[in-house]
Design a protein with these regions (language model features):
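Function-determining sites in protein domains
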Residues: 27-142
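Secretory targeting and sorting signals
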Residues: 1-28
Length: 142
């Protein structure tokens, strides 16, 4: 009887502890924001909405992986509230990571800003941007 009571009490304490230890807001959210840079050292915020991609970004920042360190995604030609310095942002649903990509989608953060009216034609066809020198710097709050 004493053994059964000890097991029940242990299980109760374990369940109660799970309720007390909650994930941090950055870890619990379905959306995460990351600051990235490129060869120009300008800063740009990327919104991620896919849990696997959020984890990959965190793994890159923690040094747990070096695979696919560069950012690729489809540009939206409008400002985002989390990225007010720029007249464009990446569609969070299209953001991914890569090792190597074709040259036609490569550009720097400020070059896109300066040539945004040309994006989607011969410059960044399909509005796909794959900055070869992009890298994440840190996770940020929105």
């Amino acid at each position: 009887m004493r053994s059964l009571l000890a097991k029940i009490l242990t299980a109760f304490v374990a369940i109660a502890a799970l309720g007390v230890v909650a994930p941090t807001p950055a870890q619990a959210a379905d959306t995460a924001y990351f600051e990235m840079t490129d060869i120009t050292r300008e800063r740009f915020i990327v919104k991620l909405t896919n849990p696997a991609k959020i984890q990959h970004a965190r793994d890159l920042l923690n040094g747990d992986t070096t695979d696919r360190p560069h950012v690729i995604g489809r540009i939206l030609k409008r400002q985002a509230d989390y990225n007010p310095q720029w007249s464009y942002h990446l569609n969070g649903d299209t953001v991914d990571f890569f090792d190597v990509a074709i040259e036609v989608c490569d550009a720097t953060i400020p070059y896109i800003e300066d040539h945004l009216d040309e994006a989607g034609g011969a410059f960044l066809p399909g509005l796909v941007w794959c900055g070869w020198s992009t890298r994440l710097v840190r996770e940020v709050t929105a």
